[in-house]
Each structure stands twice: as structure tokens, then as C-alpha cells.
Amino acid sequence: MLPSKVYLSKGSILIDATLTEGDNRGRENFTVMHEVFHQVLHKNCFRRETPDYIHSTTQIALNGKKSLKTSLDFIEYQANACAAAFLMPQNVVRDEFKKRSSNLGAKYPLPCDCMVESIIYDMADEFSVSKQAMRYRLNSLKMITFDAPLFN
């Protein structure tokens, strides 16, 4: 667990070592790209910090549905959206999901049932992202919906 503040030189990206524990390469990939997009998009947002500190973010800012009430909420949303688009390009993900789900019906979004979950797991492995990241990406592309009993 990171302390609330860690001294770093400007431009450094610090990844908690617990992220690389276990077998979750997909989560690691997403987190690294999320942090890279902070460097690309939000470099100026953290320039006022003296000395050079990085603040750890809470899990709710990185995952799940949260209303964008603060500047931090918004920049976390942007980094997540860009990481998702980079790792799971819209057209490629959409085409692959349509190909894999063609026997489940042609009307999208599909309810996220056991069959769809199986496709999500396979696609997450193929794109080297977490199952949760693939689930959110397919939902944001309106390919799946969480209105099925599995998620209620």
C-alpha cells in the first residue's frame, strides 16, 4: 500500500508493486496506459505541486460508475477512456464481439449473461486487458447491457 504522498521527480510514473502480483497482466496493462495518458493529457495539472509529489487515487476513481463532480474525477475519467481506446480500439472490439456473438442474436446491446461473459473472458485475454475493462468497454460501445439478472 502506498503512503498518501511519495517523493518523485517530475515525469515519473509510480506503479504499486501489488499490481504485478498474481496473474493479472490485463490490469497491469490498463493501469500503465492509464498513467501514460495522465502524462500526455494532464502534465500541467500537477505542475503546481511542490515538492514533486504524486497522490495515490482511490479505487472508486479508477473503476466503476461515479459522477464527475471534481477535476480529479474528470481527469481520471479521461485517462480511463484513453487507455480503453488505446488498448481496445472501438472498431476492432466491436467487429470482434459481433463475430463472436453472431449466434446469440443480432440486436445490440446484448444482455450480459453467461454466454456473453464467456465471450468477454476470451476477448479480455486476446486484448490483454482485465475482464472488467473489457466489460466496461463493450458496455460503453453499447454492445452489452448490465440489465441481466447476473448484474442485478
Model-derived features with residue positions:
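Active-site hotspot residues in diverse enzymes, especially metal/ion-binding acidic/histidine motifs
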Residues: M1-N152
